[in-house]
Amino acid sequence: QQSEQLQQKQCQCTSNPRTGQLATAFRYSVEEDRRVYTINYNLNIFSTFIHAKTGVKLVFLLDTGADISILKENSDKFSNIQITNKINIQGIGQQKIQSRGQTFIEIQTGKYVIPHDFHLVDKNFPIPCDGIIGIDFIKKYNCQIDLNQEEDWFIIRPNNLKFPIYIPIAYSSGINTTLLPARSQVVRRLIVSSKDDNILIPNQEIQTGIYVANTIATSSNTFVRILNTTDSDQLVNMDTLKYEPLSNYNVVQANSEHRNKTVLSQLKKNFPELFKSQLENICSEYIDIFALESEPITVNNLYKQQLRLKDDEPVYTKNYRSPHSQVEEIQAQVQKLIKDKIVEPSVSQYNSPLLLVPKKSSPNSDKKKWRLVIDYRQINKKLLADKFPLPRIDDILDQLGRAKYFSCLDLMSGFHQIELDEGSRDITSFSTSNGSYRFTRLPFGLKIAPNSFQRMMTIAFSGIEPSQAFLYMDDLIVIGCSEKHMLKNLTEVFGKCREYNLKLHPEKCSFFMHEVTFLGHKCTDKGILPDDKKYDVIQNYPVPHDADSARRFVAFCNYYRRFIKNFADYSRHITRLCKKNVPFEWTDECQKAFIHLKSQLINPTLLQYPDFSKEFCITTDASKQACGAVLTQNHNGHQLPVAYASRAFTKGESNKSTTEQELAAIHWAIIHFRPYIYGKHFTVKTDHRPLTYLFSMVNPSSKLTRIRLELEEYNFTVEYLKGKDNHVADALSRITIKELKDITGNILKVTTRFQSRQKSCAGKEQLDLQKQTKEIASEPNVYEVITNDEVRKVVTLQLNDSICLFKHGKKIIARYDVGDLYTNGILDLDQFLQRLELQAGIYDISQIKMAPWKKIFEHVSIDKFKNMGNKILKNLKVALLNPVTQINNEKEKEAILSTLHDDPIQGGHTGITKTLAKVKRHYYWKNMSKYIKEYVRKCQKCQKAKTTKHTKTPMTITETPEHAFDRVVVDTIGPLPKSENGNEYAVTLICDLTKYLVAIPIANKSAKTVAKAIFESFILKYGPMKTFITDMGTEYKNSIITDLCKYLKIKNITSTAHHHQTVGVVERSHRTLNEYIRSYISTDKTDWDVWLQYFVYCFNTTQSMVHNYCPYELVFGRTSNLPKHFNKLHSIEPIYNIDDYAKESKYRLEVAYARARKLLEAHKEKNKENYDLKVKDIELEVGDKVLLRNEVGHKLDFKYTGPYKIESIGDNNNITLLTNKNKKQIVHKDRLKKFHS
């Protein structure tokens, strides 16, 4: 700063006779200049000059840290010293030194003379040379110190005069000392004695107060920055310097001004105008973390990926044929990958095919772009999974809080920023016409790539809080609730990118957005919505036409179930069609559900972000089919939804009582919303009042105890919400939180056990609560049942002038007069119900069924009876049986069936049984079953639309031949893999009597080839057959075969189309033969035709299951002689280059039998597997009581005897029982079943 101020002052030259020349600012009298000039030099470099007047060589220290230029005094060399211009100098230690004066000298190089004023100092001044060239000289002549070339130069402009530089070297071993001025930072040249070309000198303190900065060094030429923090000059020993080999690095070009401007220009395209200057500052500071597409992709410095396979056998897949027009594009892309060090040449035995796929076309360019893709499907089959959990989307969305701004950062070629382990690179090999290559980075297409990338990103950004940024794969979204918060979070994320050498794509980064689309969700500062870009897809989604399309639609909607009220209740109609063995029948319920689900996605409910500083509320309800829940929070006096949830009940849950279903809904909702509510107090609201009582019981049932224990860790309050105020639906469809009103006065509050432990006065409140809940019934005590049989056959309570209680509708167990309960012909309902419950209690009756006869209900409505009964009855339930309507008119019958069978909503053209069940619930007429059966049978739509079982004629017993080869069945196998002999098919002939098989390999199945094979290989060996049976293949249905049969007087029978039973005998042999061949050609596919005859021989010498004879024995009259040691077959070593045919034949027969035995074992295993699928085993232990099936009893005897106690359990499911007479009996487990006492 001093030198800049001094240079602004100029004066007339006094020492040079050339008047008018501007002199430097260092020519002042003592009175004028009292400032202190520093000469703390920070470069230990020197250069030699020639004094123009005397020709003496002068060695100067080039010091960019010195304010002035100085020269040691020597009376023999200099004269014309101006004593008046003295200054104070400080820098070598703390002592101030006054200069001797000032002199003007000229430096000469060639024909050029360079004049300058130097301040003279004593000859003992502590510098190891004649003087110092300071910043005044360097700025005056625009000098440059060039240390970047093979030779170092001190350059004086504008004439580019070059003076060589020499630097005293400090060695890292041996003689290694250097002098450091006090409180100064200097740069010293250093040579490190290391076998590594590139080394890292880490930040370290080499002696007290002396520090060395991080330095990337070479063993030959290195500059090190050293800091002396002490108050005295220090002689430093460099032997204590520590260094290490440099690894995991990339050589990149230094950031140039042009490059930085290009990056900023790309970033500015996505800068909002309001925050442009702030973003430009922060991006300029971290300009190095952004990469241009023209630059090589670097790798991160924290994680390498290793690939692990199931075995070491190389996977080699042939290349696909590429069009000639794409060859040039492939070579160009591969060369770029090589240049960017993403791939390298390979000599691996692995190979995966490559192909080009088109990229999405740009609207501004007509040129088609391609992406190079490697098909790693075969590698993926053997690649061991690299399991790392991807973050849950709902967990990410929950962390958005009250975010106001969103910034999206995109990694440049994310997978390619992960380096592959050296030992894993061969697995990724691929090849082109120019050679084979392998990836050095993680390639696209490997099944482990997403999880591996997620692991790397999670590690790299582990210090970033979810409230600052969230990531999913290569989507990195920074959030902020204010401008300052966003800039702070961006700075931290950018810092992580720099720390771990992660590069961002500047063109794909966006900042300070008010909404962003993330994984199909639109995140805004007001809430979360589905991505509206998918609305068109939802609107135009086709109606599912089969189970697969229905499954896809349900899966698509399931992705957005967070936004769909009553998702489970609606989707169950369509989900039912996705189950196995369920015929696909798109009903009106399915269509309504389909339309509703689409409309819910197109017009979604706006969900709120969870605010974890506020209390949550869960509102639940259940229907017979499903349960639902909504998580809400209070925002400005309104309960707004945070999340919806629903699920369909299982079959068992659907059959439970209303109370159990409502309880299950609360239990499931609390577990489901655990991430939101755990560790905080929350409220549960239900419109089922008995649940408030159940959660406050002192001694609950075992079932309730289990549920309460599971919820013991949660801190919540159960509140009863009156039905009229509860807009949470009995299924989730009726949840409409926006209409909830302030209902504080209508809520009965119940405290859970968690809170009761925190209250000192819980006892009195608990007693008051029990008093209240005694009046609460768990279910309605009087309800209606629409029935037919119950009214006509099973009435258990009937009123006339007296009450009659019946047992099973027959035996009267009680009768008593109720005449005293009538006043003016009207029954006193209150007294009647009390007496009814009393009388039922005498006979221990808890539930009765009642027909609403006129005697009671002519003056009392059913609703009044139900309301009164629910208030009075405590321990008795009454089912009111509504009688069905009797129909006699034919037109009414037709109208009823037209509605309940033909109507698309109420009928749906169901079958006879279902239609009859629907009609019986409401109506009755004589011979109704017969009438409905005839109506449905004659329904034209049912006859046309519904499938029926295919008819099958009884099996026909064909004529049995008298001699071998009288009747021969012929068929063709193929195409098979082309053998070395050129064969792809085989003609098979089997004798219908002996089951003797002949197989002939052929090159093709033309008529001529097939006819020649049959004639030469069968007829000339075994003689012509009497009957020749074939299918309708063109190789048999032609003139050549017809002429052959005519010439040899062979009867030719052809099967009908699609009726393979005619040639069933050969079809069954084909299955066995195919298993033989398939089991071998899995290892060698080119010599199946050689092995074919060995397998045929095995087939003919194996006993047939049809007649228990070997086909060979029936044809030749004797059994075939087989080597005796075949039954003791051990490991078989292959024999190659065998000249002895007998040995080779023996070997092939051994292999054939081994494979036959292997197939038989596999067949047994398959049979066991199929059998076990139908087995329902029971678990028994010693001490259990069981019942024993009675195998010798008569029809009227018990099917089981016992119970007996299990004494012991032995092998093979044998169990020892201890009978009632203390005798032991051993029985099989299949005869037992558990006894429930």
Swiss-Prot record:
GO cellular component: DNA polymerase complex
Residues covered by the Integrase catalytic domain: 957-1119
Alphabetic keyword roster: Aspartyl protease, Endonuclease, Hydrolase, Nuclease, Nucleotidyltransferase, Protease, RNA-directed DNA polymerase, Transferase, Transposable element
InterPro entries, sorted: Aspartic_peptidase_AS (IPR001969), DNA/RNA_pol_sf (IPR043502), Integrase_cat-core (IPR001584), Integrase_H2C2 (IPR041588), Peptidase_A2_cat (IPR001995), Peptidase_aspartic_dom_sf (IPR021109), Retropepsins (IPR018061), Retrovirus_Pol_polyprotein (IPR050951)
Enzymatic reactions: DNA(n) + a 2'-deoxyribonucleoside 5'-triphosphate = DNA(n+1) + diphosphate
GO biological process, one term: DNA integration
UniProt-listed CDD domains: RNase_HI_RT_Ty3, RT_LTR
Keyword Transcription regulation among UniProt keywords: no
GO molecular function, one term: RNA-directed DNA polymerase activity
Active site: residue positions: 63 (for protease activity)
Location of the Peptidase A2 domain: 58-131
Pfam families, sorted: Integrase_H2C2, RT_RNaseH, rve, RVP, RVT_1
The EC number(s) this enzyme carries: 3.4.23.-, 2.7.7.49
Residues in Reverse transcriptase domain copies: 338-523
Protein name per the record: Retrovirus-related Pol polyprotein from transposon 412
Organism: Drosophila melanogaster
Lineage: Eukaryota, Metazoa, Ecdysozoa, Arthropoda, Hexapoda
